């Protein structure tokens, strides 16, 4: 080793080094610069240095300044040592953190390894159990074959001598297949070992309970829990019964509406929603489980999952309505339903009054029937008859049609002094369309000018042949005023009902027809229902048209509350959620949910139908409709009536009012009092509000006064239709009529400055007026039509010139006049038109 001990010798040349650098500038100029480079010596402590010098913060640890590296101050040295300590501390923390992470990773690896070993052990046990089961089955099969073979040999071979009896212990221990006197074979020894192992396994499986002695002695080790024992027993039981195999997929019938949510489709198939979404994505549809798909796509998905699709429609909700045919043994006799029809003022209601021995006509406005009345009459013979009284006015066509649809017998009332009239013919058509028998009642037979034979003859023109004319239609001459022939009429009705043999099942769910509907102020929506099948009871839940409800009360034709109504019984039904349409069918259902669902479906179907009817199919049709509407003036009205039938009759009557130039537009019609909503609607459309047998409430009257909306009240449909006709006639353009008043012959044409050409004329016929219109005729051809600018007589402006006098005329904005032309003078008159 040298004296320097591997260190470099110190020298004096280690301070700084100098040199020159040449700088270049533009235009080829250069400059030499003297550069001095200084080097700093950094002292690093040796690795074996004591740590005490770095842990104290006193100035003594900085050492002797003479031994410190050059250029390092105390503060710099302190900062460097602090940084060194922080670095060592971080290194210790990092090492600790890495050790913790390594330990956690090792624990995770150990846990996974244990799980894998447990899984492998479980797989081995399962495989061992399966192998053991297979061996047991194979061994049992071989033993059965061996036993069968020995039995077959024993049958063929002669009976051997009885062997010497062996000791009891040997017989008990030897297996059945072992032959006496021979040592056990290898297979038998293996079989015995398997049996012992199975027995031990079964004992350990059933040793789940831990006794006190075992716990205190500490023998037996840790046993499995009771839950684990039960799970193992359940697995063994399922394996023995063959449940270990994968269950077969259950094929389901999936109800498929027109549109369905993906989640709902998955629920109906009992599949995971994610699988259904995945299947749809494979089909190119990026949907979520909350989106709807159409029925065709859903059917493809259902078939892909192996199920069967059953298409259903929204209309299937009505299948809950009972439409089963009644059995013959359940049918019982029911009263006949008789509808009285005929022309207005022929005495239908008066005839019914005479039968009921009451007065109904006095209660009808104007003495005419404006509602369908339903009554039950009990005759002297004890028979019960149900009568329907229909209006005879032309506006009530739909009411008569409804009466004919629900009736069994039609009584056609014809006045003997008036014969067959238009509504009589209409009633005959309704009766024939309904295919119901008809009885002709020739009324007003007590009048002096009554001619029943004329009635019978007129009926022949409409293919109604009465018995007295060798036909099959019954006819009776009656007088509602004197009561003549009423008994015979009732006998004929009873005879006809007996022939029809009318029967119905009162035990089924009720079904009936709405004869009339109204909105009562105190009772709400009220429907007059004629029960056709079954029995309607209080508390029944029903659906009628687009409305539904629960029977709150039943009121018969005498105003009495009843608990139930059987077939052919007319009642007023309270408890509806809205006013139904007259003619709707009432059906009783099981639950409110069914009734609400059916009503909602019907309302949606009606709304879609109206939208489809109002929508134009092409742009050309839309433009043509808009052009046609622009040429037609409209009279908007809002109709409110006391009952649904009257409202419909008014609307139908007003639809017939008008022509190609004007029409009545019904903005809204309904049942009940006039409300503020009706006033608001009328004010927005500048319409009038018409109330038929109803009045406006206080708020509606106040709103009408503020908004200047006209409200008109009527109780007779004649007056209502006539007033609307007058109002609609005011929208017609006035008819312009021309009246010829004279001719003038042009003799000479003069040119006057400031006026133009002036014709010197002589009035040849009639009179010439300054305010009249004129036509210029040349060779009997009209070449100009206009007005006069001036009419003078001897330089004086005059209003008219009589025949035979001369005058001067100048035309307004026209000067092509010649001698010999003829001027035709006429006046126009506007005449107000009226609707027919």
Curated annotation (Swiss-Prot):
Domain tr-type G residues, every copy: 333-501
Keyword Signal assigned: no
Annotated compartments: Cytoplasm
Bias (Polar residues) ranges: 18-27
Signal peptide: none
Source lineage: Bacteria, Pseudomonadati, Pseudomonadota, Alphaproteobacteria, Rhodobacterales
Gene3D superfamilies from the UniProt entry: P-loop containing nucleotide triphosphate hydrolases (3.40.50.300), Translation factors (2.40.30.10), Translation initiation factor IF- 2, domain 3 (3.40.50.10050)
Annotated GO CC locations: cytosol
Ranges annotated as biased composition (Basic and acidic residues): 88-156, 185-206
Annotated region (G2), positions in chain: 367-371
Region (Disordered) location: 1-233
Family: Belongs to the TRAFAC class translation factor GTPase superfamily. Classic translation factor GTPase family. IF-2 subfamily.
Function: One of the essential components for the initiation of protein synthesis. Protects formylmethionyl-tRNA from spontaneous hydrolysis and promotes its binding to the 30S ribosomal subunits. Also involved in the hydrolysis of GTP during the formation of the 70S ribosomal complex.
Protein name according to UniProt: Translation initiation factor IF-2
Listed Low complexity bias regions: 50-60, 167-176
Region (G5): 479-481
């Amino acid at each position: 080793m040298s004296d320097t001990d591997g260190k470099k010798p110190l020298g004096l040349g280690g301070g700084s080094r100098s040199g020159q650098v040449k700088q270049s500038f533009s235009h080829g100029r250069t400059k030499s610069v003297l550069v001095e480079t200084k080097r700093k010596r950094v002292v690093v402590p040796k690795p074996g240095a004591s740590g005490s010098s770095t842990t104290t913060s006193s100035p003594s640890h900085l050492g002797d300044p003479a031994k410190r590296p050059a250029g390092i101050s105390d503060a710099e040295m302190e900062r460097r040592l602090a940084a060194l300590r922080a670095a060592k501390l971080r290194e210790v923390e990092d090492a600790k953190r890495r050790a913790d992470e390594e330990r956690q990773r090792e624990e995770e690896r150990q846990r996974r390894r244990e799980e894998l070993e447990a899984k492998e052990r479980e797989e081995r046990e399962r495989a061992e159990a399966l192998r053991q089961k297979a061996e047991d089955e194979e061994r049992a099969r071989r033993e059965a074959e061996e036993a069968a073979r020995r039995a077959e040999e024993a049958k063929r071979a002669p009976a051997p001598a009885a062997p010497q009896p062996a000791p009891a212990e040997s017989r008990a221990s030897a297996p059945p297949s072992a032959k006496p006197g021979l040592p056990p074979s290898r297979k038998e020894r293996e079989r015995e070992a398997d049996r012992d192992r199975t027995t031990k396994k079964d004992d350990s499986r059933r040793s789940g309970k831990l006794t006190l002695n075992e716990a205190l002695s500490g023998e037996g080790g840790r046993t499995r829990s009771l839950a684990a024992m039960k799970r193992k027993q359940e697995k063994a039981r399922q394996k023995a019964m063959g449940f270990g195999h994968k269950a077969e997929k259950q094929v389901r019938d999936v109800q498929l509406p027109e549109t369905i949510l993906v989640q709902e489709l998955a629920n109906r198939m009992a599949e995971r929603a994610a699988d259904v979404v995945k299947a749809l994505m494979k089909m190119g549809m990026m949907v979520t489980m909350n989106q709807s798909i159409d029925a065709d796509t859903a059917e493809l998905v259902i078939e892909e999952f192996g199920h069967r699709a059953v298409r259903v429609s929204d209309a299937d909700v009505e299948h809950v309505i009972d439409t089963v045919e009644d059995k013959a043994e359940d049918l019982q006799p029911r009263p006949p339903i008789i509808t009285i029809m005929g022309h207005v003022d022929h005495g239908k209601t008066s005839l019914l009054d005479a039968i009921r021995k009451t007065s109904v006509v006095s209660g009808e406005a104007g003495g005419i029937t404006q509602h369908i009345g339903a009554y039950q009459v009990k005759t002297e013979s004890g028979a019960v008859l149900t009568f329907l009284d229909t209006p005879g006015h032309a506006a009530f066509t739909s009411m008569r049609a409804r009466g004919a649809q629900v009736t069994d017998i039609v009584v056609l009332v014809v006045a003997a002094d008036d014969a067959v009239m238009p509504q009589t013919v209409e009633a005959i058509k309704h009766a024939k369309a309904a295919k119901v028998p008809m009885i002709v009642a020739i009324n007003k037979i007590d009048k002096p000018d009554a001619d029943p034979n004329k009635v019978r003859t007129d009926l022949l023109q409409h293919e109604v042949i009465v018995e007295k004319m060798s036909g099959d239609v019954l006819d009776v001459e009656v007088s509602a005023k004197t009561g003549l022939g009423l008994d015979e009429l009732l006998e004929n009705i009873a005879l006809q009902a007996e022939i029809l043999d009318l029967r119905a099942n009162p035990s089924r769910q009720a079904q009936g027809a709405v004869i009339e509907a109204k909105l009562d102020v105190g009772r709400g929506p009220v429907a007059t229902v004629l029960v056709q099948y079954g029995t309607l009871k209080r508390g029944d839940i029903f659906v009628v048209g687009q409305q539904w409800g629960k029977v709150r009360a039943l009121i018969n034709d005498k105003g009495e509350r009843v608990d139930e109504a059987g077939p052919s019984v007319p009642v007023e039904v309270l408890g509806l959620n809205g006013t139904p349409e007259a003619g709707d069918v009432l059906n009783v259902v099981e639950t409110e949910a069914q009734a609400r669902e059916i009503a909602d479906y019907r309302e949606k179907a009606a709304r879609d139908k109206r939208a489809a009817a109002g929508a134009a199919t092409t742009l050309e049709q839309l433009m043509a409709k808009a052009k046609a509407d622009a040429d037609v003036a409209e009279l908007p009205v809002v109709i409110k009536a006391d009952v649904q039938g009257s409202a419909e009759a008014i609307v139908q009557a007003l639809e017939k009012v008008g022509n190609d130039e004007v029409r009545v537009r019904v903005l809204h019609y309904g049942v009940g009092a006039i409300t503020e909503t009706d006033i608001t609607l009328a004010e927005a459309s500048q319409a009038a509000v018409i109330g038929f047998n109803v009045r406006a409430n206080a708020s509606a009257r106040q709103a009408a006064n503020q908004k200047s909306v006209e409200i008109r009240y009527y109780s007779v449909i004649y007056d209502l239709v006539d007033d609307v006709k007058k109002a609609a006639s005011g929208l017609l353009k006035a008819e312009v009529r021309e009246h010829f008043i004279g001719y003038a012959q042009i003799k000479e044409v003069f040119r006057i400055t400031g006026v133009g050409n002036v014709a010197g004329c002589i009035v040849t016929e009639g009179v010439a007026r300054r305010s009249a219109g004129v036509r210029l005729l040349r060779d009997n051809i009209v070449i100009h039509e206009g007005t006069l600018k001036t009419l003078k007589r001897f330089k004086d402006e005059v209003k008219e010139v009589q025949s035979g006098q001369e005058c001067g005329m100048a035309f307004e904005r026209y000067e092509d006049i010649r001698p010999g032309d003829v001027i035709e003078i006429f006046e126009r008159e506007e005449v107000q038109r009226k609707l027919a």
